[in-house]
């Protein structure tokens, strides 16, 4: 049955290898079980329900990817967009979390339609690669600022906007320790480095009496506080257009990059560089994002951590199915997730931020018409506390720099149209 469903022999793999790969992938991305409730919980959402929604969204998404596309790629609520959901859409812009979930659903529906009608290729190819790298780096810097704030390492300062936190308190010190530990474990190629870092810091905090111990295993909490609580009509407000756009474009670029990157490592690319069943994979991803918003979590997306499972030998969707099963098993570990303090998840955020900024190394810094938009894009996200603003500033700056330099041939209609729309949005409809 498994052979017929996943074509194991054709992919030169077996059940044992796929199970090992699935466990490896799960361990490298299981940190989301602790981080996602911590971030989304700041909106006022029930953390227990978020934990269940995170587990179910990851399980459903990974299963869909395995069954529909037969790829060894796992899904879960994405880092970056969960922070954008909480800190920008809800806390900064003042929308309710129900409206934010509605925006996630709408963006996922648009993603689904783009995947079905194959418009995705046109959109992705219209956006210059340096700008895509800048968007990823900007999200990384956005996450870094949030991580430092949650760790207590960066605090408000009326004179200088921000300042250094109290390094004599245990929270910031443990956060620094956690970050160093994660980096060291990752450098030594230890599987599950991020999750180990979170758990070690939590254990030390419990031992010092800084954090109360809430237990490890119990029956799953109720999903009722977030299930089907999204407000789609509220998300159709004109002030939410840029938010929906940000959710859509970041998910689109992130998924495309992840799918291609992991597929290359798995040897799934065709000789002409084409990724077979890309459409199926994106349909699975968008369907998972829609399902996640119904359950009560931010955008569900493909995880680059799937590459660790590929390195362990994963080649088919059976790897993703194993990950799905482990996320369902994780439903019974809600008390452990509730015990983890913010300063223990902050190192994970900071580490992910480091990974996301790596794309800046590929930028042609000698071309000022490329370097300027990239820097503006990356800086605008943390400094305006908005991924949407960063994307808007990036598009506008890229178009302006190229046009004013007389390099019109490096522009395309989609880029120009989007830049004009962003100018209109920022000038007349900025929320």
Regions found by a protein language model. Name each.
Residues 1-49, 162-165, 195-279, 420-424:
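Helix-loop-helix hairpins and the membrane-proximal interhelical loops
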Residues 2-36, 57, 78-136, 264-360:
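Helix-loop-helix junctions within the multi-pass membrane cores of secondary transporters/permeases
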Residues 23-30, 60-63, 67, 148, ...:
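Hydrophobic/aromatic residues within the transmembrane alpha-helices of Major Facilitator Superfamily
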Residues 38-50, 88-99, 238-241, 341, ...:
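Helix-coil boundary and interhelical linker segments in multi-pass alpha-helical membrane proteins
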């Amino acid at each position: 049955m498994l052979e017929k469903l996943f074509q194991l022999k054709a992919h030169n793999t077996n059940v044992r290898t796929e199970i090992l790969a699935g466990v490896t992938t799960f361990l490298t991305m299981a940190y989301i079980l602790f981080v996602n409730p911590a971030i989304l919980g700041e909106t006022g959402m029930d953390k227990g329900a978020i934990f269940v929604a995170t587990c179910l969204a990851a399980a459903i998404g990974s299963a869909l990817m395995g069954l529909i596309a037969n790829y060894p790629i796992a899904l879960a609520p994405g880092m970056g967009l969960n922070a954008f959901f909480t800190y920008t859409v809800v806390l900064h812009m003042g929308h309710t979390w129900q409206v934010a979930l509605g925006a996630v659903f709408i963006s996922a529906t648009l993603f689904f339609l783009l995947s079905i009608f194959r418009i995705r290729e046109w959109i992705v190819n219209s956006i210059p690669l340096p700008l895509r790298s800048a968007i990823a780096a900007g999200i990384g810097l956005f996450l870094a600022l949030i991580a430092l704030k949650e760790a207590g390492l960066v605090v408000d300062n009326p004179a200088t906007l921000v300042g250094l936190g109290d390094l004599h308190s245990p929270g910031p010190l443990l956060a620094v320790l956690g970050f160093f530990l994660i980096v060291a474990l990752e450098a030594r190629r230890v599987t599950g480095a991020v999750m180990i870092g979170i758990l070690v810091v939590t254990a030390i905090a419990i031992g010092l009496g800084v954090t109360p111990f809430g237990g490890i295993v119990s029956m799953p909490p109720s999903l009722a506080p977030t299930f089907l609580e999204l407000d789609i009509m509220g998300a159709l407000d004109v002030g939410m257009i840029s938010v929906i756009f940000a959710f859509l474009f970041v998910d689109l670029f992130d998924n495309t990059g992840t799918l291609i990157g992991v597929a290359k490592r798995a040897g799934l690319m065709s000789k002409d560089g084409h990724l077979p069943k890309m459409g199926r994979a994106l349909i699975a991803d968008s369907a998972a994002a829609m399902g996640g918003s119904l359950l009560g979590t931010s955008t569900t997306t493909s995880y680059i951590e799937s590459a660790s499972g590929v390195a362990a030998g994963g080649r088919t969707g059976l790897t993703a199915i194993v990950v799905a099963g482990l996320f369902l098993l994780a439903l019974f570990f809600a008390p452990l997730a509730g015990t983890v303090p913010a300063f223990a998840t902050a190192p994970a955020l900071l580490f992910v931020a480091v990974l996301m900024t790596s794309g800046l190394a590929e930028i042609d810094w000698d071309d000022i018409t490329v370097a300027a938009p990239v820097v503006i894009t990356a800086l605008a996200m943390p400094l305006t506390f908005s991924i949407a603003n960063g994307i808007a500033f990036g598009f506008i700056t890229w178009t302006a720099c190229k046009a004013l330099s007389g390099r019109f041939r490096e522009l395309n209609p989609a880029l120009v149209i989007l830049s004009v729309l962003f100018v209109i949005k920022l000038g007349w409809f900025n929320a």
